[in-house]
Amino acid sequence: EAKLGLKFEHRHGQAYYTAQLKPQHVDLIRQAETSKSVLQLVNTWLERMPFFGDGQIWTGFENEISVEGWHPFWTRYRQLYQQSLASAEKENQQAFDLVFADKTEASADRQLSPAASRAALFIMLYRGYPVLQLPFQLLNGLLEIDEQLSSWRYRHMNMVHRMIGTRIGTGGSTGKDYLRAAADKHYIFREVAQLTSFLIERRRLPQLPIAMERKLGFAI
């Protein structure tokens, strides 16, 4: 979990996490927590998406009324997303800006930077293009890891409940309660999963410029 990207401060039962381990094993965990995690490497990879730095391939978007700090594509997409929201979802617009706008209050608390979040959402939106198929499968694989870990924790929780019921476990709380709380909190790639809240209908997606479509397609 530490190597994947679950930070110590995001764990449930932090005191119990290493209390039952031998010193040499605690040292191994500390080393894992201080080294680059999978989530950090994914963030760096997403930030390197090249397409938004080349203004020449974004013909047709130059006349967008630009919002300060936003690429013309994201200015248009932001408007389309706002139009897609139901009356009960209007607060999602603020969440959109917090996640994707540079230099926001939420940026410091998130492990994915705004640039990485925009790149991941772009991959999800246009995953039908050949160049984005493998990146989308990678992102989807990260979510499957979380799902499998959650499934394992749930089965483990049920096994502990059958074995000791509501007896106190080694963590000082009932074993079932500890495992349930850990299962609810330990989602490593939660920020990737939350990006689906910002999708719109595929038929309403902005049409990409021909030059961009060529870059995302098969080279002939």
Regions found by a protein language model. Give the residues of each.
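Extended amphipathic alpha-helical segments with heptad-repeat/coiled-coil character used for oligomerization
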Residues: 1-60
